[in-house]
Amino acid sequence: MKSRATVICAHGGHILFVRKDRSKWSLPGGKVEPGESLAAAALRELREETGLDASEPLYILEFDAGNVRHHVFEVAVANAGDARPLNEIAAVAWYAYGAASELDATAATKSIVSSFLRRL
């Protein structure tokens, strides 16, 4: 099973979503590099995909989708307005907690966000 570090970046009642070209919305994240901790991978992927820096990622849940295990971290950022699409990401957007279920997002993303919201 592949491991993926997935990030829920929550700010002011909104969650940050990313989208690759011609893809559905998802949460920032990606593969864990050899020798890299899950938390370090989460922070690196957030920075590489959105330009945002976070610290103190909180491990909140694990979610299996097919052959991928999402290790989900919650982070807070001070510079939320600076989010921008970088590298393979075509768009970034903040959506209100309640709007997440209506997004054209992957099934895994919707399930992870739903689990996160139940914790609040």
Regions found by a protein language model. Name each.
Residues 18, 60-62:
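Residue-level detector of high-confidence beta-strand sites
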Residues 27-60:
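The catalytic Nudix box helix
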Residues 63-99, 108-120:
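Active-site-adjacent beta-strand/loop module that shapes the phosphate/pyrophosphate-binding cleft
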Residues 24-27, 92:
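A short local loop/turn or secondary-structure capping micro-motif enriched for an aromatic residue
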Residues 13, 30, 44, 95-98:
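Structural detector for helix-capping/boundary residues
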Residues 1-15:
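Conserved N-terminal beta-strand and adjoining loop/helix that marks the start
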